[in-house]
Amino acid sequence: MTSGDHSDTGANTALPKKGNAAVSVIMINRNGGSYLGPAVATCRTAIEHALTIEPRIEFLIVDNGSTDHPEAVIDQQLQGAPFEWRVVHALTPGVNHARNAGLEGSAGGLIFLVDSDVEFDPQWLSAYLLAASRHPGARVFAGRVKVGRLEMPAPSWLALEGPLARTSIVVQCDYGNEVREIPLDDSSGPVGPNMGFRRDVFTEFGNFDTRFGLRPGSLVPGAETEMFDRLARKGLRFLFVPGAIVYHPLKKSQMTKSYFRKRLHGVGRAISRLRRSRGERATRVLGVTLSVLPQLTIAAARRIGSTLTFQSPAQRFHATGDVAIWLGYLHEDFIDWRAGASVNDRDSAPVP
């Protein structure tokens, strides 16, 4: 039953479906380094626990151009695994290219997408499967994401919880202790390291938009943001499953102000792209989006005020982050204006 196949694919090249899996766990990896082994090992444990609920489970690891030779680590961790598994090599850089390759190469009607730097609670997959069986009408799923291992103590300017936490970077997802359905909207939804779908969602609404998401040389995020915006506009909701827990680390290289500013600048760019994907058009003067200027002015005034009123380092840096977001929005809109059309539309099919 165990498989160690290694397949190559571009993001839009369909792979033959292998076996008759009912559930597909798809892990996206690019240079996972020391995090990959624990991610695969703890995911294996979670899958093995779930086999008593559903024995037809497959595990795909989609490698998106790693240079750290992950195959040896994967083979070591999955040797003798009592379920189908394989590695898919997605050749086109970008997390959404990798996700789409995983969708095309998997067979399950129930799909869970995860990252290769998280660690899994042993009951992670069991919680999802039980919730899915008890809520057959649910089509989108979110698990709980907690802050995992810190490679260094968090600096004073970095809030890990509360209203100042940047949960798109210090990744977290928590909507309480009850399994419940929640509307998809701008402030509520699953997060990329721990989310699930019934396959018919992609059949009906299309795959992930490859104009969005982190890729080599780009810190513009929002890989799943466009998908959830698309689904929200069609009235879909998501089922939050609190027992489906993963732990997301915070790496030393990420705990710098420069990294956060770049990521938040990317958040602003992603917001601009999302609004364009909706067909929204901005009023500009010399490339400057007029509707954004009040938000940028307010954010800048708040940043200055946070210094003048001797607010905490975390409060001051949160205000700095808001400025970075709106500057990113203006940057993306200016690029679009200068090009005369979205520079990203050349790389992707139209959004459904």
State each model region's role.
Residues 32-48:
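Short, well-formed alpha-helical segments that are part of the catalytic scaffolds
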Residues 42, 63-72, 118:
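A conserved acidic beta->alpha catalytic loop
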Residues 111:
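Short aromatic/hydrophobic "clamp" motif used to bind/position activated sugar donors
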Residues 123-160:
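Conserved donor NDP-sugar-binding/catalytic core segment of glycosyltransferases
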Residues 161-187:
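Short, flexible, basic/aromatic active-site loop/helix in glycosyltransferases
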Residues 192-197, 201-206, 211-244:
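A short, conserved alpha-helix in the catalytic core of glycosyltransferases
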Residues 262-269, 276-352:
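Non-catalytic, C-terminal membrane-associated alpha-helical segments of glycosyltransferases
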